[in-house]
């Protein structure tokens, strides 16, 4: 194991520990074992089925029009505009703030 990289060492350690637990589990029970080919087929089938479901949901989601966005746009177009409760700006009015225009010595 001197020529192995750290990742290879970790992989070999995990495979060894996993293999030992598999042997111990088989010796303790009378269960039928699953071959690695069957296990790989189950995992790949599950991945393919998951991908197929995700793609079907994506494409069906694109076919269905968006319910909320479409109704909000049409609803907003039918609402008549109301007058603004705010007063329009009239420009600068010096008479309103003329009494504040005094200069105090501590602001200089």
UniProtKB/Swiss-Prot annotation:
InterPro entries assigned to the protein according to its UniProt record, in alphabetical order: Tyrobp (IPR026200)
Keywords, in A-Z order: Calcium, Cell membrane, Disulfide bond, Immunity, Membrane, Metal-binding, Phosphoprotein, Signal, Transmembrane, Transmembrane helix
A single GO molecular function term of this UniProt record: metal ion binding
Transmembrane segments: 37-57
Compositionally biased region (Polar residues): 84-108
Annotated membrane topology: Single-pass type I membrane protein
Residue ranges annotated as Cytoplasmic topological domain: 58-108
Complex and partners: Homodimer; disulfide-linked. Homotrimer; disulfide-linked. Homotetramer; disulfide-linked. Homotrimers and homotetramers form when low levels of partner receptors are available and is competitive with assembly with interacting receptors. They may represent alternative oligomerization states or may be intermediates in the receptor assembly process. Binding of a metal cation aids in homooligomerization through coordination of the metal ion by the subunits of the oligomer. Interacts with TREM1. Interacts with TREM2. Interacts with CLECSF5. Interacts with CD300LB and CD300C2.
PANTHER family with a match to the protein in the record: TYRO PROTEIN TYROSINE KINASE-BINDING PROTEIN (PTHR17554:SF2)
Name of the protein in question: TYRO protein tyrosine kinase-binding protein
Gene name of the encoded protein: TYROBP
């Amino acid at each position: 194991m001197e020529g192995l990289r750290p990742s290879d060492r970790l992989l070999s350690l995990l495979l060894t520990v996993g293999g030992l637990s598999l042997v111990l589990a088989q010796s303790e029970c009378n269960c039928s074992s699953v071959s690695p080919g069957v296990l790989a087929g189950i995992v790949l089938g599950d991945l393919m089925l998951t991908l197929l479901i995700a793609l079907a949901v994506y494409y069906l989601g694109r076919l269905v029009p968006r319910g909320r966005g479409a109704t909000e746009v049409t609803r907003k177009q039918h609402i008549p505009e109301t007058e603004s409760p705010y007063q329009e700006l009239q420009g600068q009015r010096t008479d309103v703030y003329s009494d504040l225009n005094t200069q105090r010595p501590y602001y200089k």
